[in-house]
UniProtKB/Swiss-Prot annotation:
Physiological role: The alpha subunit is responsible for the aldol cleavage of indoleglycerol phosphate to indole and glyceraldehyde 3-phosphate.
CDD domains, A to Z: Tryptophan_synthase_alpha (cd04724)
Protein name: Tryptophan synthase alpha chain
Keyword Amino-acid biosynthesis in annotation: yes
Domain of life according to the entry: Bacteria
Single GO MF annotation: tryptophan synthase activity
Record bears the keyword Lyase: yes
Family membership noted in the UniProt record: Belongs to the TrpA family.
Top-rank EC class of the record's enzyme: lyase
Highest classification ranks of the organism: Bacteria, Pseudomonadati, Dictyoglomota, Dictyoglomia, Dictyoglomales
Length: 253
């Protein structure tokens, strides 16, 4: 097992900050410099491996995926970059990728992830039944398989997920795909409030976050926050994201 659960348990701040970036965007050099500069602010880095059909993503992250793929970014050079840069020695990294990328020679790839220092995987297109079968194999390679729950998940499946989840729960708090929203959805807040009563596993709010106000509003409800599209939008616009990143981080304290 990876140490992600311990990280939540032993945190000395209100929320763990989990920024999401797509590998190789805008380029590896920018990402490396930015991540090392901000390593003490990043509790867990969620790094997306570019994919041609990222079904969980909205238009911003779809565009970023496309641009990264055009540049030739893929799973292999992402892993090479992580290893060569030493990022995983300074930051806990989880990869978001689609099962197509790893299902062939799966065990060989899991061994590679462990060698690189990856702590866990988020696989949006992996059915729950398949995930349940794979958790022991992931555990053997010291990798957390991070499972999703959402307001549209059936009650019996929620109970199943809460029972088998080896790590924190990635809470999809809104219907639809990724993307920054103006306010927190009442349905998502109510859903997570209910789930919180049923489990002691950490809950991390994903999808729709983009402001320090929203993050502050989640204190006491969840254990961590993921911010992706809002960061990606600013990168697409060639904005300097440092001040914005600092603002998000401070809201998690």
């Amino acid at each position: 097992m990876a140490n992600l659960l311990e990280k939540f348990k032993n945190r000395d701040k209100s929320l763990l900050f989990v920024p999401f970036f797509v590998s190789g965007f805008p380029d590896f050099d920018f990402l490396e410099k930015f991540l090392f500069k901000n390593k003490d602010k990043i509790d867990i880095l969620e790094l997306g491996v570019p994919f041609s059909d990222p079904v969980a993503d909205g238009p911003i992250l779809q565009e970023i995926n496309y641009r990264a793929m055009v540049k030739g970014v893929n799973l292999n050079n992402t892993l090479d970059w992580l290893l060569d840069s030493g990022i995983t020695k300074k930051i806990d990294v989880i990869l978001l990728l689609y099962f197509n990328l790893i299902q062939n020679k799966l065990e060989e790839k899991l061994k590679r992830f462990k060698e690189v220092g990856i702590k866990g995987l988020v696989i949006p297109d992996l059915p729950l039944e398949e995930a349940e079968k794979l958790i022991p194999l992931f555990n053997e390679h010291n990798l957390d398989l991070i499972l999703f729950i959402s307001p549209t998940t059936r009650e019996e499946r929620i109970r199943k997920i809460l029972d088998i989840a080896p790590s924190f729960l990635y809470c999809i708090s809104v219907k639809g795909v990724t993307g920054e929203r103006d306010r927190l959805p009442e349905e998502g807040v109510a859903f997570i409030s209910r789930v919180k009563k049923e489990t002691n596993k950490p809950l991390v709010w994903g999808f729709g976050l983009g402001s320090s106000y929203q993050i502050n509003s989640l204190k006491g409800l969840v254990d961590g926050v993921i911010v992706g599209s809002a960061i990606g939008k600013r990168l697409l616009n060639n904005e300097d994201i440092q001040d914005y990143f600092d603002e998000l981080y401070k809201a998690t304290l």
